[in-house]
Amino acid sequence: LIPVTHTSANGLPLGSEADHSYRKILFFDCGLMLRLLGITTGDTTTLATQILTSTAADLVNKGTIAELVVGLEMLHYMPPNLRHELYYWVRLSKNSLAEIDYLLPSHLQILPIEVKAGSQGGMKSLWSFMREKHLTEAIRCSLENFGSFSHTDKEDRDTARHVSVIPLYAVSQIIKITTSDRV
């Protein structure tokens, strides 16, 4: 089991504001998770592949499985000389629900990563988090092809915000982005 720890994400390092009483847990294997969910019909590897390519029947847990795959793949591609910790953010307010699936340090900034199990879905939590934390870059990992979204935030002095889209099959690119040297 791999913990993903809540952080307030007000700056780096992300662990400095970690709240270990709020954690999401990743199973170390998709097949094991599907088995525990009682989804045992046929080959679970094939089922996981179908889920991530949107050819499987619509499952309630599809988003959770996509988050699991992204988390495990990010850990797999992290350089071995770095400490492997995953963080997420959630607004802990009774009247407002917002969550960012993963946060990574990238070039002395926080990089929010939103995971979507399909090719559509709103990004209200992502835009809100970026505004609150004064960030201009983020990643959306989904079934979409490579692409990007730009947004001029009228509520924050017309700040330009940019979201890069990375397909679920290319999660390794996220780690390349966060660890590459900028020119």
Where do the language-model regions lie?
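Active-site-adjacent loop/helix micro-motif of nuclease/hydrolase catalytic cores
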Residues: 118-128, 149
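Domain-level recognition of nuclease-like catalytic cores that cleave nucleotide substrates
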Residues: 146-183
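Conserved catalytic cores of phosphodiester-cleaving nucleases, focusing on short active-site segments
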Residues: 70, 74, 100-119, 138
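Short beta-strand/turn micro-motifs composed of small residues
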Residues: 140-142
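Short, solvent-exposed loop/turn segments at secondary-structure junctions
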Residues: 32-33, 118, 145-146
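Arginine/glycine-rich "motif VI" loop of SF2 helicases in the C-terminal RecA-like domain
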Residues: 79-80, 129-136
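Short, solvent-exposed amphipathic alpha-helical segments in soluble enzyme
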Residues: 42, 128-132, 155-156
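Accessory nucleic acid-recognition modules appended to NTPase machines
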Residues: 1-98, 104
